[in-house]
């Protein structure tokens, strides 16, 4: 609990733990409302060449820059690849990825880590298309 220097100030409890079930339920409802509002208004991503893509790469950070060059080289060979670059990982661009699952042949989750994003991509497509992972 923080009060600062002012003793008359309302308490600011810094925890989500509440032992009273009624208050805990109200807190959870408030948290879920906040999460929903954030998910609706704060998701950010960039789509590059996704309109007519046969394949989609989902990549963020440094890997997305590498993948941009990859889709340029693939285009020279006649391969249509799009890039979806999440700018926010939370909230994740689930709906945008799900839309592309209806028209691409496959999705690659390209990451410079052990695969923290690939499961989110798989959840987004809900089995509609195969999702592979590359951890270069």
Question: What are the functions of these language-model segments?
Answer:
Residues 44-79, 84, 90-96:
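Redox- and metal-dependent alpha/beta enzyme cores, enriched for Fe-S-associated oxidoreductases
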Residues 62-64, 88-89, 113-115, 136:
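Short, glycine-/Ser/Thr-/acidic-enriched flexible segments
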Residues 104-105, 129:
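A short helix->loop->beta-strand "cap" motif at the edges of active sites that frequently abuts
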Residues 111-136:
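Peripheral docking tails and interdomain loops at the edges
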């Amino acid at each position: 609990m923080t009060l600062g220097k002012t003793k008359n100030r309302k308490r600011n409890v810094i925890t989500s733990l509440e032992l009273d079930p009624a208050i805990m339920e109200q807190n959870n409802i408030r948290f879920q409302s906040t999460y929903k509002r954030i998910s609706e208004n704060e998701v950010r991503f960039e789509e590059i060449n996704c309109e007519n893509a046969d394949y989609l790469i989902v990549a963020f950070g440094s890997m997305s820059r590498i993948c941009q060059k990859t889709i340029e080289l693939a285009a020279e060979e006649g391969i249509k690849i799009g890039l979806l670059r999440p700018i926010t990982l939370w909230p994740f661009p689930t709906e945008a990825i799900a839309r592309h699952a209806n028209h691409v042949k496959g999705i690659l989750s390209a990451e410079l880590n052990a695969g923290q994003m690939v499961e989110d991509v798989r959840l987004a497509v809900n089995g509609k298309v195969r999702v592979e992972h590359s951890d270069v």
